[in-house]
UniProtKB/Swiss-Prot annotation:
Residue ranges of the region described as Domain IV, binds dsDNA: 378-500
Organism this protein belongs to: Bifidobacterium longum subsp. infantis (strain ATCC 15697 / DSM 20088 / JCM 1222 / NCTC 11817 / S12)
Record note on domains: Domain I is involved in oligomerization and binding regulators, domain II is flexibile and of varying length in different bacteria, domain III forms the AAA+ region, while domain IV binds dsDNA.
GO molecular function terms noted in the UniProt entry: ATP binding; ATP hydrolysis activity; DNA replication origin binding; lipid binding
Primary site of residence: cytoplasm
HAMAP family found in the cross-reference section: DnaA_bact (MF_00377)
Gene3D superfamilies per UniProt: 1.10.1750.10, 1.10.8.60, P-loop containing nucleotide triphosphate hydrolases
GO CC entries: cytoplasm; plasma membrane
Region (Domain III, AAA+ region): 156-377
UniProt-recorded name of the protein: Chromosomal replication initiator protein DnaA
Length: 500
């Protein structure tokens, strides 16, 4: 099944072109599903693996999810044998939207997504209201101050993330204690250590702290921090050149199997990547048998990882699994004090208390709120006071004004260029389903209605459907900036429309 040219790039282009034709004529795929395939770019064929590039995680998840079986079948039809796709996420480089450069325009009316735009990769790069974006972009799971990423080129560790800058509390104290034991080399019984919890709760901070402390104890150690995406891309790169692939694979194996401490972040994103998981399995075994330290972080417990073979999950569970939870009030206040101290800012206690009381989900929320307050104070030449903080953050605080669910549906429909009937109707396409879930979430957050009553308003849906929608949007707000922006912008608009 090798193209006459012998060129893996040309071969991939031919295979993908034919595969795309097969998929486009498939009656089982919706136009929306076929649309996900348009932005896929073939990079090369290496044995039974075709490397495909996508420009964002939404496309990746769609293709690896609902489209996976259809894609495998189409590849089999075209090539006459089993061929497996390996994906690389290669973000597009796009110019900054003009609307983001106009802070004087607080509510750009023309940047709400149309039905055709909603969910497309090109739209995800645009914040809904750039001047009101509540949180700064950050690479860390547990940000402490507005510090630049200080990543070591060899170990990939962020030197700013240490145990000293990690604020302990009831929600994370056990995880920190175990992590410190692993870093000191006294936690042999905890190998591997698996840390899991929601986004923004400190997992990445702990991984980096382990590596940094281990090097302080023994500078001769070989330590490597890597995300699952980086591990995948390095493995795919090692396969790229057919003339040198054996040497590159050997180099890849040496790089990872000779480390003393391996720290791998966001392991859940390896799910379903069969070739990469097989490589990681052998890497894991080699390190574990050599008594090397392995620490992994995930958003779910090992037993709940999707797309992982039982043999790998059982190895994860053979060590110790610990979780990190959202911080309690005292810990949130302590975190804010740490952030302020590292920024060299003096923030009154009543301001820190206010922010800690109102922002409860994760550390990113806390830092974003504190950053917004200090920025407004600095730009307006005012001292940081509780009154200023309340005024600055009022858009994100709850209101005593009762908002009608029909107002929420109407506002969400208008925002996404849909109709009221679309949101209460039966359509399950993504460009309707996601706005509907957002509307249900807002109805739950901004009204006193029960889940059952909300379901009745949305076309007589079951209360479990509403519960699923609320959980889904709550989770995605932590994972995807654009979803967070949508909800915050709609919250502001609804509150304003009810106070006018």
């Amino acid at each position: 099944m090798v193209n006459a040219s012998g060129d893996p790039v040309i071969e991939a282009a031919h295979i993908w072109s034919d595969t795309l034709t097969v998929l486009k004529h498939s009656a089982s795929l919706s136009p929306r599903e076929k649309g996900w395939l348009e932005g896929v770019v073939p990079e090369g064929v290496f044995g039974s693996t075709i490397v495909l590039c996508v420009d964002n995680n939404d496309t990746l998840q769609a293709i690896q999810g609902d489209l996976n079986d259809s894609l495998l079948q189409a590849l089999r039809t075209v090539t006459g044998e089993n061929m497996f796709p390996a994906f690389k996420v290669v973000p597009k480089t796009e110019p900054e939207p003009l609307s983001a450069a106009k802070p004087a325009q607080p509510y750009p009316s023309e940047i709400s997504p149309t039905v055709a735009e909603f969910g497309k990769e090109s739209y995800g790069a645009k914040p809904v209201a750039a001047p009101r974006e509540p949180m700064p972009a950050t690479e860390s799971q547990f940000p402490v101050g507005q510090q630049k990423m200080n990543r070591d080129p060899e170990t990939h560790l962020n030197k700013n993330f240490t145990f000293d800058s990690f604020v302990p509390g009831d929600s994370n104290r056990f995880a920190r204690t175990v992590a410190l034991a692993v870093a000191e080399g006294s936690g042999q019984d905890f190998n591997p250590l698996c840390i899991y919890g929601g986004s923004g709760l400190g997992k990445t901070h702990l991984l980096n702290a382990i590596g940094n402390y281990a090097l302080v104890k023994d500078p001769g150690l070989k330590v490597r921090y890597v995300t699952s995406e980086e591990f995948t891309n390095e493995f795919i790169d090692a396969l790229q050149n057919p003339n040198q692939s054996q040497g590159q694979i050997a180099e890849f194996n040496r790089r990872y199997r000779q480390v003393d401490v391996l720290l791998i972040d966001d392991i859940q994103f390896l799910g379903g990547k069969e070739a990469t998981l097989d490589q990681f399995f052998h890497t894991f075994n080699a390190l574990h048998q050599a008594n090397k330290r392995i620490v992994i972080a995930s958003d779910v417990a090992p037993k709940n990882l999707k797309g992982f073979e039982a043999r790998l999950i059982s190895r994860f569970e053979s060590g110790l699994t610990v979780d990190v939870k959202p911080p309690d009030l005292e810990t949130r206040i302590a975190i804010l004090r740490m952030i302020a101290s590292m920024n060299g800012s003096k923030i009154p206690s009543d301001v820190l208390d206010l922010i800690a009381e109102r922002f409860t989900e994760n550390i990113r929320e806390l830092e974003g709120a504190l950053t917004r307050v200090t920025a407004v104070a600095s730009l307006s030449n005012q001292p940081v006071t509780r009154a200023l903080a309340e005024q600055t953050l009022q858009d994100f605080f709850t209101t005593d004004v009762e908002i009608k669910p029909t107002d929420i549906i109407s506002q969400v429909a208008k925002y996404f260029h849909l109709t009221f009937e679309d949101l209460v109707g039966k359509s399950r396409t993504k460009n309707v389903a996601v706005p509907r879930q957002i509307a249900m979430y807002l109805a739950r957050e901004m009204t006193s209605m029960s889940l059952m009553d909300i379901g009745q308003v949305f076309g007589g849906r079951d209360h479990t459907t509403v519960m699923h929608a609320c959980t889904r949007i709550s989770d995605r707000m932590q994972q995807k900036q654009e979803i967070y922006n949508y909800v915050m912008e709609l919250t502001v608009r609804l509150k304003q429309s009810n106070t006018n």
